[in-house]
Each structure stands twice: as structure tokens, then as C-alpha cells.
């Protein structure tokens, strides 16, 4: 017992010394940055990163790179900050660190500070999503998608925000963003189409709960939609009935519904493609023998279905939803 206690105390002392050492190093690096010696400080950060990694001090390396990136961002040094941000990801990958909310929030913070138009940001988010999936082949952790969506929403990048909301579990946030997107960029005649596309895509992703939440929230909060159901817009009534039919799972109801609302469904050629997939997922409709999907259509559907073939360095960039206007 005494030996174990002594070992624990020694470990605590070593940990305290390590933290103290990191803090001293950070102080020196911060002083270099404050003096404007950006290049020298950047190279020092990189040297220390690889030294820590070689010693398997992954947490220290990650924390130092994260604080360094934030420091460079605060001084407008985008390239140096982005480089250290990528090293944060490298430490996570090599240490095989488990996904945790705190880490996802740190990554989202770094993303939010990057130049929205920089290629480094695209590379960072693609790699961050891949790490956050934990090797599951999915398109990234839902919480990280949510955090990215919120940042992009603040930047009024509605299209990319929408993509990330679709891969999160935040139906309410998605609906609120779509209300703003519709009122800011859409035509009044398209208010129903914004939410219809989102609901159909959520269903294609087998996320029935978020599909229902996004529809209810959007129709309640959009200033151009009068109380319902039933609604003035036939397409909204179709979506309302579809969500009820999905709960029931009766193929005859689904088939009649799609036939009756064909005039509304013809407003966007993608609707029937989505409904083919929804029929397979929720109503036991057999898949088509040969796929008619190609080009942009096929890429979009593959992304929405969570195809592992789309899971690569550029999947986030290539899988953005189509514009409505």
C-alpha cells in the first residue's frame, strides 16, 4: 500500500513538473509572438510538437499546438495558426484519442477562426470529420457537424451550414437556420421547398426524429406560413402526411400519397428520387435493378445515404446540398 501511494505521489509530481514545463515554454513562445517574431515562434512550435510526439507526450503536444494556434489567430497570422491546427489533428490521430465533447469543441473553435475562403479550412474540416467518425466509415460525429453548422450559419453560409445540420441531430437548429435562409435568400413561393428538401434528406439518412422536428419547428416559426396543419401549401401537406405514413409503415398509404401529390412533387426533380429511397427504407419497396443516378444526382444521393465511398479527404467539400434558387 505504501509503495503504491509513493508511486502515485511521484506520478503526480511528474505531472505537475510537466505542466509547469509546458507553461514555461508557452510563456517564451508567447513573448516571441508578442514581439512580432512570428516565423521564429512558428518554427519553435513545430520543433516542440515533434519532440513531444517522439516522447509520446501527445496531450502536451496537442495542448501546446492548440494554444499556439489561438495565439496566432489573435495576431492575424492565419497561415501559422492553420498549420498548428493541423498538428492538433495529427496528435489526435496518432495518439488514437477517443472522441470527447471537449475535443470537438476545441476543433470547432479553431475552425471558426480560420479564413472562410482558405483552402486550409477545407482540409482541416475534412480531416477533423474523418477523425471524429472514429473509423466507423460515417461522415463525421453528429456533435462536430452541429458545431460546424452553427459557425457557418453565423457566417451566413447557409448552404454549407445546411449540409452539416443534416448530418447532426439538431433538427431544431436546422429549422431555425432554414427560416433565416428562406427569408434572406429565397422567394416567397419557395418557403415550402426549403423545409421539404430538408425533411426528405433527413429521412434518406434514416433520421426520422430530426425530420419531424425540423418540419414542426420550421412551419411554426416561418413568418410566411400560416397555422396548420392542414396548410395552404400542398407540398407542406404532403410532407405532413408523409411523416405520419412513415410512422405507420403502410406501403399502400405511401403509394397513394405520392400519386396524389405528383403536381407538387414535380416542382423539384429530386423529390421523387428521395422518395424512391424513402420507400426502400420505411415501406419495404425493393431497390431498382439498375441505378438511374449519375453525375451530380448520384454524388448527392451517395452522400446522403452515407456511402463509405464518399468518405475521403474531400467528401465534405463535394457533398454540399444543391441550391434551391
Swiss-Prot record:
Q: Which InterPro entries match?
A: GET4, TPR-like_helical_dom_sf
Q: Where, per the database record, does this protein carry Phosphoserine?
A: 11
Domain of life, per lineage: Eukaryota
> Region labeled Interacts with BAG6 — which residues?
194-270
Q: Listed GO cellular component terms?
A: BAT3 complex; cytosol
GO biological-process terms attached to the record: protein insertion into ER membrane; tail-anchored membrane protein insertion into ER membrane
Explain the post-translational modification.
Ubiquitinated by RNF12, leading to proteasomal degradation. When unassembled from BAG6; ubiquitinylation is modulated by BAG6 quality control role and effectuated by RNF126.
Pfam families per the UniProt record, alphabetical? GET4 (PF04190)
Q: Which UniProt keywords apply?
A: Cytoplasm, Phosphoprotein, Transport, Ubl conjugation
Q: What is its main location?
A: cytoplasm
Q: Where in the cell is it found?
A: Cytoplasm, Cytosol
Its function?
As part of a cytosolic protein quality control complex, the BAG6/BAT3 complex, maintains misfolded and hydrophobic patches-containing proteins in a soluble state and participates in their proper delivery to the endoplasmic reticulum or alternatively can promote their sorting to the proteasome where they undergo degradation. The BAG6/BAT3 complex is involved in the post-translational delivery of tail-anchored/type II transmembrane proteins to the endoplasmic reticulum membrane.
Q: Output this protein's name.
A: Golgi to ER traffic protein 4 homolog
**Protein's UniProt keywords contain Phosphoprotein:** yes
**Of which family is this protein a member?**
Belongs to the GET4 family.
> Region (Disordered): which ranges?
306-325
Give the record's subunit note: Component of the BAG6/BAT3 complex, at least composed of BAG6, UBL4A and GET4/TRC35. Interacts with BAG6; the interaction is direct and localizes BAG6 to the cytosol. Interacts with GET3.
Amino acid at each position: 500500500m505504501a509503495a503504491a501511494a509513493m508511486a502515485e505521489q511521484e506520478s503526480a509530481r511528474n505531472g505537475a513538473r510537466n505542466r509547469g514545463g509546458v507553461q514555461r515554454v508557452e510563456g517564451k513562445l508567447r513573448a516571441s509572438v508578442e514581439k512580432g517574431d512570428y516565423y521564429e515562434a512558428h518554427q519553435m512550435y513545430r520543433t516542440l510538437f515533434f519532440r513531444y510526439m517522439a516522447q509520446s507526450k501527445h496531450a502536451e503536444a496537442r495542448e501546446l499546438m492548440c494554444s499556439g494556434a489561438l495565439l496566432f489567430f489573435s495576431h492575424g497570422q492565419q497561415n501559422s495558426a492553420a498549420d498548428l491546427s493541423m498538428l492538433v489533428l495529427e496528435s489526435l490521430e496518432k495518439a488514437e484519442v477517443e472522441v470527447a465533447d471537449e475535443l470537438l469543441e476545441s476543433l470547432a473553435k479553431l475552425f471558426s477562426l480560420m479564413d472562410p475562403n482558405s483552402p486550409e479550412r477545407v482540409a482541416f474540416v475534412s480531416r477533423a470529420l474523418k477523425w471524429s467518425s472514429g473509423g466507423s466509415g460515417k461522415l463525421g460525429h453528429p456533435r462536430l457537424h452541429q458545431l460546424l453548422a452553427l459557425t457557418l450559419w453565423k457566417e451566413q453560409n447557409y448552404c454549407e451550414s445546411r449540409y452539416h445540420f443534416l448530418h447532426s441531430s439538431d433538427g431544431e437548429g436546422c429549422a431555425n437556420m432554414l427560416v433565416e435562409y428562406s427569408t434572406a435568400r429565397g422567394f416567397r413561393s419557395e418557403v415550402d421547398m426549403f423545409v421539404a428538401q430538408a425533411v426528405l434528406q433527413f429521412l434518406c439518412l434514416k433520421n426520422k426524429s430530426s425530420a419531424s422536428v425540423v418540419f414542426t419547428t420550421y412551419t411554426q416559426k416561418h413568418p410566411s406560413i400560416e397555422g396548420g396543419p392542414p396548410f395552404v401549401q400542398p407540398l407542406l401537406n404532403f410532407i405532413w402526411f408523409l411523416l405520419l405514413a412513415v410512422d405507420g409503415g403502410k406501403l399502400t398509404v405511401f403509394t397513394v400519397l405520392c400519386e396524389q401529390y405528383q403536381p407538387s412533387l414535380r416542382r423539384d426533380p429530386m423529390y421523387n428520387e428521395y422518395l424512391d429511397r424513402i420507400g426502400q427504407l420505411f415501406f419495404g419497396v425493393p431497390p431498382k435493378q439498375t441505378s438511374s443516378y449519375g453525375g451530380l444526382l448520384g454524388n448527392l444521393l451517395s452522400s446522403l445515404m452515407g456511402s463509405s465511398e464518399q468518405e475521403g479527404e474531400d467528401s465534405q467539400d463535394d457533398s454540399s446540398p444543391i441550391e434551391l434558387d
